[in-house]
Amino acid sequence: VKQIGDRATVMRDGATVGVFDIASVTKEELVESMIGRAVQARPPRRHNPGSGPLLHVRRAAIPGVIDIDDITVGRGEIVGLAGLGGAGRSTLLATIFGDRKADLDMTLGDEHIVSLTPRTAVGLGIGLVPEDRKRQGLFLEQSILRNAAIAALTPFRINPMARAREVCHPPLTRLGVKFASVDQPVGLLSGGNQQKVVLAKWMARGIDLLLLDEPTRGLDIGAKADLFEQVHA
């Protein structure tokens, strides 16, 4: 818009909220008008040396797919994985979550792990926000509440859905998920709000290690800022 436009009309929630002269308006002003609040494209950099090791992957190998050794994550650290598409990032995260069979040797806290399933991983305090949230992270026809509570429902033996509302309301509110009712299908939400529900699922459960695979894909700048803020929290 800044490169080819003369004027910009910004709409939000079905209404015009501003008309701007491209020569004088800043990118930040346009974004604030679109989102309804000021946002940072990137959160301020924070140095966190961690408080001791949490995860140590000594080996994670699938013949012809990945061959990884010596990855360490400290408690409180944010560790990024970089690489081109197909480099193995998603496969490694799926392996750590127990969703891919592999030659595995890793330690999580005091637990030595050589074999893992997703059920066991969740029990150990590992959560995964997958790259394809619609196919792998959500039950689109189920309610927002059921999706947010699904990882935490098992311990609720008595009146589970009432307990789910109590446990899931704080993370949904904290993440700023926009919905008419927690009983509406999660598939009706925007991509950014769907991603927040996936994240709320693990916040409701309470985990030690959160694996994020392309977490900002398909999100608008406001949803990205919200996600960055929670990851840094």
Where are these regions (language model features)?
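Glycine-rich phosphate-binding loops of nucleotide-dependent enzymes
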Residues: V1-A233
